[in-house]
């Protein structure tokens, strides 16, 4: 057994596809003092049983670019490392049985073209030409992406690991991290990571394992299913939860190796060719969350008990779409864990609670297609100190502490697993884990007919339903049911009076004799204004990019109120702390839950303020 080092520049926790990708990309950037620690064996958690689909189209341009890069990387890994990956680009087909789904697919196809992807909108007949096994009787149309593909998850992970070792990284298996060590950072961030404690198995049988410490400048949490638990060791919120994920593999039915991947999201199913067999999996609308406490500590290459009753509706859908499945024998019924986040987007970046502690976890069952791009940009973030592109979609700082609550996560995971194949309607609102944060005006707004949406846990009145009308969204890609109500509100705000409840906005009190000096250093605009004056400003980074867009109100000589978007509360608070010099006399207090913010229209003298001003009212 190789002896583990006592120090390293970077320690990566977790030997799944994302951990190996981070190690690989760090070495590509010239960092060789990289140590990866895996609790059991590489891929043994969730990577090994992944379906291995490598799609390229995501919801935004930057996420699509990362998925494209993953595909390009997998296409070259075997030549670079000599390790086979099983990667092939047979394309993928997504089918639509109704006009709403087809509209969504066509919108996605238009976006794909803007992002530089090859894509075709095809008829049902053209779909069956590409996929002869398909029942097209109820199809409206489909979208074909010819460069999508699939790979072998274990092989591609081993290729990344081999590439990392070729670049100088050291990989250790059967090394369980049991503690994250921290120290005072000497800045207003207060704490930074300093290393990890590892349980090193003894060489002799029956002997207890030995605890050893590896000092490290940077630690990366790539622990997958155990990412939430590892985050807790460090005092870092990593909101993810396990769920059971199901698929079957048929007996060999002679499928051609060139068959495209099939997705029928309205039926919750996907299918791919697997050595002449067919793998059929599902993302059902209501999943089965699996608390980590029910998963054995030594879980490795494991699976859960079968649940045919839960999988049966998806299987019936699959047999309708692919009639050949009715006569196919079942070789494998698989039920195993995957980890999911509250918004179905993965978690990436430096933790706001702990300097130099990075996270890449919660891949939401698309880890294989995400790992290449996510590993690349996180490595660049680590090396350069900032992300190479806008990664707000997946930034860990978008999450709030309440979202790490086990009850919240369990309830939300019932919904989040199915979001990948749900209809992505404009203004769609979460259905689970609601009512976490409410304004003091919530009850009165509700009685007035408010239809609430959710933003970072806050229940916000998005629009008001007319009397004797239910305050509920009716989703559509056409004009939705709230248009007329919103028009009436808009007219009232212009011609009469309106009071906007902005309690969900984040609020920080910055005070102390150096408060003005600190804020003037951080803000692009001048906050040296009289008391009661509000300043609209940006926070810029050293590259001239905008980090935040907010207002700063001077309440008293040495007291300022910063008001920013609720969604960026954690991000902006972390940025503020990060940029306060050590030697100044200033304190920052998050008063978001303690203060309400109201913004008035015109016409009521009691609430009439001069523009760019503010004061407390009772």
Residue ranges, per PLM feature:
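Glycine/proline-enriched, intrinsically flexible loops and inter-domain linkers
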Residues: 389, 396-618
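Dinucleotide-binding Rossmann-like beta1-alpha1 core, especially the glycine-rich loop
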Residues: 52-130, 266-271, 275-277, 298, ...
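Flavin (FAD/FMN) cofactor-binding and adjacent substrate-gating region
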Residues: 76, 88, 97-174, 178-184, ...
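C-terminal catalytic lobe of FAD-dependent flavoproteins
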Residues: 266, 297, 302-437
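Flavin-dependent oxidoreductases
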Residues: 21, 180-183, 192-203, 210-307, ...
């Amino acid at each position: 057994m190789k002896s583990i080092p006592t120090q390293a520049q970077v320690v990566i926790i977790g030997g799944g596809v994302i951990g190996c990708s981070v190690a690989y990309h760090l070495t590509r950037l010239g960092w060789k003092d990289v140590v990866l620690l895996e609790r059991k064996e590489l891929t043994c958690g969730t990577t090994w049983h992944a379906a291995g689909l490598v799609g390229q189209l995501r919801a935004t341009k930057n996420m699509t670019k990362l998925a494209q890069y993953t595909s390009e990387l997998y296409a070259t890994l075997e030549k670079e490392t000599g390790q086979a990956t099983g990667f092939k680009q047979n394309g993928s087909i997504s089918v639509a049985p109704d006009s709403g789904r087809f509209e969504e697919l066509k919108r996605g196809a238009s976006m794909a073209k803007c992002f530089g992807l090859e894509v075709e909108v095809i008829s049902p007949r053209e779909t069956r030409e590409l996929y002869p096994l398909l029942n097209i009787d109820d199809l409206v149309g489909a979208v074909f992406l010819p460069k999508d593909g699939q790979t072998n998850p274990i092989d591609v992970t081993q290729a990344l690991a081999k590439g990392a070792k070729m670049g100088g990284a050291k990989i250790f298996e059967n090394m369980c991290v049991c503690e994250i060590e921290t120290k005072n950072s000497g800045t207003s961030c207060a704490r930074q990571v300093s290393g990890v404690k590892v349980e090193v198995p003894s060489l002799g049988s029956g002997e207890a394992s030995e605890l050893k410490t590896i000092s490290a400048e940077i630690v990366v949490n790539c622990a997958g299913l155990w990412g939430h638990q590892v985050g807790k060791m460090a005092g870092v919120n990593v909101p993810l939860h396990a769920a059971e994920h199901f698929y079957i593999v048929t007996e060999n039915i002679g499928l051609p190796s060139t068959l495209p991947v099939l997705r029928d999201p309205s039926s919750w199913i996907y299918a791919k060719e697997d050595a002449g067999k067919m793998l059929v999996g599902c993302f059902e609308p209501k999943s089965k969350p699996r608390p980590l406490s029910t998963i054995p500590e030594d879980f490795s290459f494991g699976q859960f008990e079968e649940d045919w009753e839960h999988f049966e509706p998806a299987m019936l859908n699959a047999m309708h779409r692919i009639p050949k499945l009715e006569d196919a024998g079942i070789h494998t019924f698989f039920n195993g864990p995957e980890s999911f986040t509250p918004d179905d987007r993965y978690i990436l970046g430096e933790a706001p609670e702990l300097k130099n502690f990075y996270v890449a976890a919660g891949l939401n069952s698309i880890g294989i297609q995400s790992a290449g791009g996510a590993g690349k940009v996180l490595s660049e973030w680590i090396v350069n100190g900032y992300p190479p592109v806008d990664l707000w979609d997946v930034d860990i700082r978008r999450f709030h502490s309440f979202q790490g609550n086990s009850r919240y996560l369990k309830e939300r995971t019932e919904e989040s697993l199915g979001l990948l194949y749900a209809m992505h309607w404009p203004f769609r609102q979460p259905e689970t884990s609601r009512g976490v944060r409410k304004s003091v005006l919530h009850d009165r707004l509700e009685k007035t007919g408010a239809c609430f949406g959710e933003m970072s846990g806050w229940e916000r009145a998005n629009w008001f339903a007319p009397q004797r009308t239910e305050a509920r969204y009716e989703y559509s890609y056409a004009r939705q049911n709230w248009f007329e109500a919103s028009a009436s509100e808009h007219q009232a705000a212009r011609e009469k009076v309106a009071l906007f409840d902005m309690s969900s906005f984040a609020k920080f009190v910055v005070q102390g004799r150096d408060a003005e000096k600190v804020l003037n250093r951080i803000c692009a605009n001048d906050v040296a204004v009289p008391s009661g004056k509000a300043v609209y400003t940006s926070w810029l980074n050293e590259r001239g990019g905008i980090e935040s867009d907010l207002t700063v109100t001077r309440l008293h000589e040495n007291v300022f109120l910063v008001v920013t978007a609720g969604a960026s509360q954690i991000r902006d608070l972390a940025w503020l702390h990060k940029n306060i010099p050590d030697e100044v006399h200033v304190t920052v207090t998050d008063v978001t839950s303690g203060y309400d913010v109201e913004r008035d229209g015109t016409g009521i003298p009691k609430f009439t303020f001069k523009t760019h001003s503010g004061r407390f009212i009772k």
